[in-house]
Amino acid sequence: MILDGALQFTGTAGTVSNDSPTTGTQQSTNVIDLVNARDMGIGDDPALKLMVEILTTFTGGTSLQLQLQGAPDSGGSPGSYTTMWDSGAIAEASLLAGRYLANIDLPRTILALPNTGASAAQALPRFLRLQYITVGTHGAGAIYGSIVLDRQDYVAYPAGITISN
């Protein structure tokens, strides 16, 4: 997996740092500026991935919800953010170090097309961020989030195992 400092939601370029959401609603340390409004989820082979991993086990709270949000350009700064993807509430018991909260293809921008029933389109985002919604007060817990080209999530088998073809 190749990490790009310009596509990290957490930390600074050249380091693998983290966010530690504690209570309430908080946003990621970094907002990714795509420079021009675009649909980063379009295309395939390979599609860009949203990867969010727990680095330190969460303690003391009740749950965590993760959202990917996008905002259009508003004169060089973010306009109103809309949620592009939502994890739903994840119970504290599942917030363990090494687990992925998101390991998905980057979602496409939602467009309102005729005869689809969509009432409004999402403006093409120039800015992307993560939002954390926590219930309870977390005493510990750290998250790393980034957009990556490919995931490093191979299945590790124990030594000496034979897989028949």
Model-identified regions with their sequence ranges:
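Surface-exposed, low-hydrophobicity beta-strand/loop segments enriched in small/polar/acidic residues
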Residues: 1-165
